[in-house]
Amino acid sequence: MKYIGAHVSAAGGLANAAIRAAEIDATAFALFTKNQRQWRAAPLTTQTIDEFKAACEKYHYTSAQILPHDSYLINLGHPVAEALEKSRDAFIDEMQRCEQLGLSLLNFHPGSHLMQISEEDCLARIAESINIALDKTEGVTAVIENTAGQGSNLGFKFEHLAAIIAGVEDKSRVGVCIDTCHAFAAGYDLRTPAECEKTFAEFERIVGFKYLRGMHLNDAKSTFGSRVDRHHSLGEGNIGHDAFRWIMQDARFDGIPLILETINPDIWAEEIAWLKAQQTEKAVA
């Protein structure tokens, strides 16, 4: 079964994220559990936790259908010790918030070397950051997102994801989220079913579907291999509809949150309905 949704706003209270997801007939959703552009957040209150859990129960969202995202400020591979410590503390807080909310996944961007350390050193720091956070939490899986490779961001090659996973001690609590726009911008073609097969065969060989814990379904304003992260509405960008139809018809993407971060929230309900409909369309030739 496919879990399909969008990254919805939690403005006015975390419970509102579940309500907004239900309003667009989503069977999955993503959210920030705190302001994603601030380091600090007030601790979750018992009321906030209870209201969130009640809303999820009311609208039938289990933790398997929810993909929280951490703060954009966090860099788990930071080259400077003090800044790395700050990011690690913030990441632990994000993991603990998920734990309190009964959520089992936390999606994050791996990190950046900022042109100050090698890729290898940065990837090792990211893995160690994950190890530290896993040691201090229970029941939450760290879900590494592939990136477009803008600037000095790592995670744009499947090999980067594999290297991070290799450095994580508890393999049962690490996974990946593949963003289609990021993959395309990083040079993984998805424009035809044949290219999708090729790209995900490479993913299986290097990382493995056993680690796939979520997807971000985004078309791309950015061009192929441009290393530029610019999302677009499904079918409106340079990837086109075929990739998303192909994903919907492949059982390897069952049972994980498939999340839209497309640029027009006004048509999310339409995009979700279209994705759902592709599951029963004639298989892509």
UniProtKB/Swiss-Prot annotation:
Cofactor: how bound: Binds 3 Zn(2+) ions.
EC number in record: 3.1.21.2
Binding-site residues, Zn(2+) 2: 145, 179, 216, 261
EC supergroup of this enzyme: hydrolase
Species annotation: Escherichia fergusonii (strain ATCC 35469 / DSM 13698 / CCUG 18766 / IAM 14443 / JCM 21226 / LMG 7866 / NBRC 102419 / NCTC 12128 / CDC 0568-73)
Cofactor (UniProt): Zn(2+)
Matching HAMAP family: Nfo (MF_00152)
GO annotation terms (biological process): base-excision repair
Residue positions binding Zn(2+) 3: 182, 229, 231
Keywords: DNA damage, DNA repair, Endonuclease, Hydrolase, Metal-binding, Nuclease, Zinc
GO function term, MF aspect, one: DNA-(apurinic or apyrimidinic site) endonuclease activity
Function: Endonuclease IV plays a role in DNA repair. It cleaves phosphodiester bonds at apurinic or apyrimidinic (AP) sites, generating a 3'-hydroxyl group and a 5'-terminal sugar phosphate.
SMART domains referenced in this protein's UniProt entry, alphabetically: AP2Ec (SM00518)
Amino-acid positions noted as binding Zn(2+) 1 in the UniProt annotation, renumbered to this chain: 69, 109, 145
DNA damage as UniProt keyword: yes
Pfam families for the chain: AP_endonuc_2
Protein family membership: Belongs to the AP endonuclease 2 family.
Keyword Coiled coil found: no
Chemical reaction(s) catalysed: Endonucleolytic cleavage to 5'-phosphooligonucleotide end-products
Domain of life of the source: Bacteria
Protein name: Probable endonuclease 4
